[in-house]
């Protein structure tokens, strides 16, 4: 979904939805969330049609701009009205993107959090702790986008991919329905003790802004190669 016709044209998505054709005349929202909000409201019927029949919807936004910030919560509200489980994933802008985008992001994340079952917030500034300082700017934004992708993929594959310890939609719904704020950690390791190292990395991930103490539920996705041994299990610390 986008207000920008050119961005939609360049998108590789199978299904594309042009929001607010009259509101923006095919242009973007100009970093104004109120324009994105108006565009989504103009296209409510189209959004309903696109979401009809879904059991679970991810509403992903790069908070701070116009379209995602303004339209995200509207899409989430429509999905909830249709009885769909809705998971929001929002990236906070880097601090170097400026005060306006920071304020837009705060507004957008607050609105989205009220409209979804579960909201995962990814603080882009904390990503800077994990990447080389010499990383080019465009590559930095790509890394931020990829973390968002990993969040969505990690949850969706619990349902779509058959695992050795299988979970289904009912399991995911039990954890994520009306859950509120959620945290996401990612860990990778190889060699000796890799399972424990990866789990520890996920728990101590810089993406986690607050303590996980008091969490009421956990979704844990472990992926390994064909050489993973049965002894490699996640041990209690």
Where are these regions (language model features)?
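Tubulin/FtsZ superfamily GTPase core signature
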Residues: 1-237
